[in-house]
Amino acid sequence: MGDARGGDAHGGPGGPSGPNGPNGPNGDGPGGDGDGPDGDGPNGDRSGIGICCSGGGIRSAAFALGGLQSLDAAGVLRRADHLAAVSGGSYTASAYAITSRYSDPEALEGQRPFAPGSPEEAWVRNHCSYLTNSARDTLRLVGVAAIGLLANLVFFTALLWTVARPLGWLYAWWQPDLRVSGECTAGASPETAWGNGCYAPVGLTGLGPWLLAAGGLALGGLLLALGVRMFQPGWPLRQTLRRVALVLVAVGAAVAFFAWALPELIVFTRNVLGGEPETGPVTESTGVGSSSDKGGANLGFIATVGGAATLAALVVQVGGTLRRAAVTGGRVVARATTRLERLSGGLRRVANTLVGAVIGPLALAAGALFILNGGAQGAHPRTGELLLWAVMALLTGAMLWFADVTAWSLHPLYKWRLSRTFAVARVVGEDGGVTAAPVPYERLLHMSDLTPEQFPGHRPGAPVFPELLVCASANVSDQGTTPPGRSSVSFVFGPRRIGYPRAVDVPRKVPWWRWLLYPAQTEQDTVRFGPLEGPTRDYERVVGERRRRDITISAAVAMSGAAVAPSMGKMTRAPLRFLLALTNVRLGVWLPNPANVPQSSSVPVNPRQIRLLYEVVGRNRVRSTFLYVTDGGHIENLGLLELLRRRCRTVVCLDAAGGSTTSFSTLGEAISLAASELDVRVDIDPAEALRSLDDGRRINDGDTVEGTITYPDGTTGRLIYGKALVTPRSPWDVRAYAAKDGRFPATPTGDQAFSGETFDAYQALGRHVGRACAERVTGAATGNPSAAASPSAAADVVLRAETQATA
């Protein structure tokens, strides 16, 4: 099996022994150090400490802020080799990196970046409701979403006009009875309309040969498939005959659809939606015609219903946010909304499935049928009609060829909102005072500028800040590239390398006819393609100035937090793809494939509009010019996998991924993935050490636990796991807030509009958990300002606070 990049399967760049293979110097197997010069494992000369911060939106960002503050105070952060972060965790991790790298050096004297009480900490806290911090922000968000939706509707409308209108003209030429007489005008009396033949029945002619051909093709395919099943010819002839049978049935169905079903649908449309003489013939002489005008209105009604259903689905999706808003209006409204939400769980699922899988495509099909019907009404296209079609065709071509499919998605706005909150530096003002200010958005903060040696104050053996790894995922749909249900690979933005460090198996490229006629050979003939990564600085150079803005630090963080998109790795919901793509609910980004960087001097300027159609159908090919990159949580939501890939000896994991406070599925998924992909074993049991006290008040027995890491070569390490849990030893103010807020410490990720009080509670909890993790790393207590409390005392605190809240 050869290497798609020109190397041998065992000795090429992507092979096991090649430089990028698992056993090569840059690989992730036992023979490599995980990231070439960045390695920190047994072959590296650094501390071997890695820190990872989980995803979870602003909840995780606040928790990670407190955790990193404690780790920094204990000296663990600056000693670490890698800081891996996902989604919300990357908000804070990138903020730490940007402040450390781009602040005025004199402003940092005497106080570490993001130390408690620092100006940048206050900045982030004051802007923690980063998406909609004001009515102006909300209006802008709605406006951007509306413009994106309009752009999508314009594209689909132009595409339908370009394809369906000429097909209608063809039907008018082939079936004269579909034409509408010029004497059938709007407002004509019934007698005149009858006399002019406006309601004459349609006689579809010449269908016999076409239907005979369609039936013959389909019957031949079925008989061939039956013969293959009964007589079992040898392999691979069996697969070829099955494919031929499938092709015959498909061609027969297509002939029947275009020759008979589609003309009948046109007539059916006129019958059902009709009512005016200017629409021409129908199937029965009932005096009821079909109206292009009324038909358009009815089809518009269908589209309106689809839009209303879409809105309903989105409303029930954000029901939690609406409930929280209702709380501020009164306890009665809040309780009523809560009961409504309890009843809407099933309706939510039905609405999502109905809108995504039925109404959206049906509305689009209805629009296509309306355009097709209009083209079938005239003997010849009118001049205005031809001009309109030409405009639509030019618009479709221009959008397909020149438009940037990322430009009108929600990603640019999301990236900007994150940047203005978390891309902050400490500066010396004109008055000599120290303050925090956002880094100008137009300034490109390159990932390649974050290598540890580039940080101010760095000295050999005395690092200032670890290497930042922003963890996202690249969606892939090639069969056999990933296990079923995963549909993505890790995609990491690092200062030295970007992408996925492994090669993958993909079918060899063959001519279409060979793929069609010889499926057995083509499916088994695979090649190694990759690795899907490249040097970050080379990647930034090759992608060009326009695309370079898509791989800045803020862009990487936005992609790491791109939680909603048509393709979402293991979280993909196929029925929702159409809905999300059509309504422009797209946070993912099409990035140039890093695997192509060594062979390219440049890449296409834009990911073209055709990729919106790829999003609709979930087409994400590994060999594509662009990869669709989304939330890191779509493959692994802790960042733990990337630290194990780099063979860290001591790993601190800060988990605020949310979910239940009594289960640890996020950690379990990460450990399972590390075992299957890296052959790294982790022995840990958080369920026992962090068990719930089962008093109904969200109190757990602990918040940190330690496990053992075993690498393939037998080298061992430590996993120190800290989770956002309230325990009897948590600070009293955290326990009091938990009594007040029934969702704490697992506020739903859909709530990104934190108040300062909620942000402070998660930060304080993170600071407490981070301190406990730091003590395990250093082996010495660093002090705990909160007095330990017994489980019963903690329960009493919660009970008293809840009693006061409901009094």
Give a label for each model feature.
Residues 1-2, 315:
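Accessory "access/gating" subregions that flank catalytic or transport cores
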Residues 3, 8-45, 790:
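Asp/Glu-rich intrinsically disordered low-complexity tracts
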Residues 44-807:
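Patatin-like phospholipase A catalytic core
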